[in-house]
Amino acid sequence: MQVSVETTQGLGRRVTITIAADSIETAVKSELVNVAKKVRIDGFRKGKVPMNIVAQRYGASVRQDVLGDLMSRNFIDAIIKEKINPAGAPTYVPGEYKLGEDFTYSVEFEVYPEVELQGLEAIEVEKPIVEVTDADVDGMLDTLRKQQATWKDKDGAVEAEDRVTIDFTGSVDGEEFEGGKASDFVLAMGQGRMIPGFEDGIKGHKAGEEFTIDVTFPEEYHAENLKGKAAKFAINLKKVEERELPELTAEFIKRFGVEDGSVEGLRAEVRKNMERELKSAIRNRVKSQAIEGLVKANDIDVPAALIDSEIDVLRRQAAQRFGGNEKQALELPRELFEEQAKRRVVVGLLLGEVIRTNELKADEERVKGLIEEMASAYEDPKEVIEFYSKNKELMDNMRNVALEEQAVEAVLAKAKVTEKETTFNELMNQQA
């Protein structure tokens, strides 16, 4: 076997391989012997068919199969010998085959980039320092009460957290526009559903009033014909409602799994959940900064085959989320996923190099801790932990999570990490 390797472009490689004629003939004869042992031909007992008849009847197909097998096996031998690491499936380009002559073919593929990590010491990471305070717990209890609130009619003027029912008609330069009209539209104030100025124009008015408000559509508004345009909305305010918050009774508290129905028990449960969310948020915030710094400091070429593979994964995930099937997934435009796919591949290659250079392996104690932390959010943590322990795929996924965390910690060990005090709400709003 003769082998030559050339670079086509960037990460592209072409391996050209020549297989000696006698190697081909030896393999063909060996395979014909195997075929002769199995075939049945009228007039002959099984395994007793003369080789010349076997060769005459099966020679062409056997030769084709042998060539395919030799191409594959010799390519594998070649890349092992040349220490080449292909990224993605190779493309075989067979040359012309002539009986009794050497056979030359080529294989085209991409290789993984050679990554030399740099700039880790210049990565800047700001670690949030946060404590869950009594005021934070109070705020979360208010949120829980608001989620369970009922609405009652209100005679007074509209305020920030009220709910209104309105008819409205929008116009630009005196002309109504598509999508600018609605009847019995229910709007919860303060949720940012409408364009800037719309809710402010309603505040202070009472049920039964009709009025006009002036607003300006944002420059980034999705409808091209409305971007940056001044508009008027004629409003008929039909109903104003205010929240009626439930009291923290034992019955209400038990809805959240606090069996003794006490306020103290609910506060303890809420605090525990908030601290778990906080731990995760801090970890994600630090991780995202470390990875962003790693990517900016290391500009690497990315094999197109890996991007294509990642696009297929993202397509299928998107189709599953919206109830689609395999065919519908492949019809989704690749442009929707290309940027995200490339970033995921880049991050994977860089973290892979961090893992390799630091000789990292998944810490089983960390894996156990991650599973326990995740399980603590469920009603029966022990059942969840047992379920994970018996599922190899889930355990492997969690080991990958742990290994990624360890890689990020290796980056942080060399990065410039500073601490910044912040509040629970500020951090959570940044995560949103």
Swiss-Prot record:
It is found in: Cytoplasm. GO terms for biological process: 'de novo' cotranslational protein folding; cell division; chaperone-mediated protein folding; protein transport; protein unfolding. The keyword Cell cycle applies. PROSITE patterns: FKBP_PPIASE. InterPro entries: PPIase_dom_sf, PPIase_FKBP_dom, Trig_fac, Trigger_fac_C, Trigger_fac_C_sf, Trigger_fac_ribosome-bd_bac, Trigger_fac_ribosome-bd_sf, Trigger_fact/SurA_dom_sf. Its EC number is 5.2.1.8. Residues 161-246 form the PPIase FKBP-type domain. Its main location: cytoplasm. It comes from the Bacteria. Consists of 3 domains; the N-terminus binds the ribosome, the middle domain has PPIase activity, while the C-terminus has intrinsic chaperone activity on its own. Belongs to the FKBP-type PPIase family. Tig subfamily. This is Trigger factor.
